[in-house]
Amino acid sequence: MEAQKNFKIGTLEVKPGEAYHGKLELSKGAFEVPVSVFCGKRPGQTVLITAGVQAGEYVGIQSAIDLARHLQIEKVNGTIIIVKVIRKEEFEHRAGSLGVKDGKNLNREFPGKADGTETERLAYAVATELFPYVDRYIDLHSGNDYERLTPFVYYAGCAKEEVVAMSRKMAEQVDVPYMVRSAVATGGAYNYAASMGIPSILIERGEMGCLLYTSPSPRDISGSR
């Protein structure tokens, strides 16, 4: 069996059997996101887990934080990248789904533009600097402060047949009552990742911008695992 190699992404390099908790620079330092990177001792796939694509969806964000806190490197095959909140500035300003500077929703802008507005440039950075490194993608969401919803999971539905099939298989592992096949290929982060050949899902759990430890976060952690 081939030995696990150091995992390199941007300016970061993580050795097998080690975990990194800190910041990842994107677009040559124009954006900085809080991440945890777990590089297992054994080779395997690279899984990307993101939260805070919409910064007011706190259940997904806390689930990513808790997963990074409790994940044991000894149990990891391959590499797991956890981005705890992509829209860091919007999270800090309680801006919800919309960009502070341009009023745009990141989850409507993929694949983004290299020379676009701030949100478009962030989408472009994620699509070109994160997605090429990963084999599977899980995006954690929840209902914003104006959204009531029943827990469900989207899986990518506009991609190559094998990508759609694997996305559905991933979705079937999530403990929610409903599963929805997406009908778009761009705009959303997971939709665009699938168009690049990456099986992807989006989990929705929690509502109204509320985080209650009596309900959703632990189940999201389990679903991500």
Residue ranges and their predicted role:
Residues 1-30:
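Short glycine- and acidic-rich boundary segments immediately preceding or forming the N-terminal edge
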Residues 54:
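Conserved phosphate/anionic-ligand binding catalytic regions in large, soluble enzymes, centered on
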Residues 51:
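The conserved beta1-alpha1 loop
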Residues 44, 58-207:
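Active-site/substrate-binding loop(s) of hydrolase catalytic cores
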Residues 35-43:
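Short beta-strand-to-loop junctions in surface cap/lid or active-site-entrance loops
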Residues 213-225:
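Single conserved hydrophobic/aromatic residue that forms the stacking wall/gate
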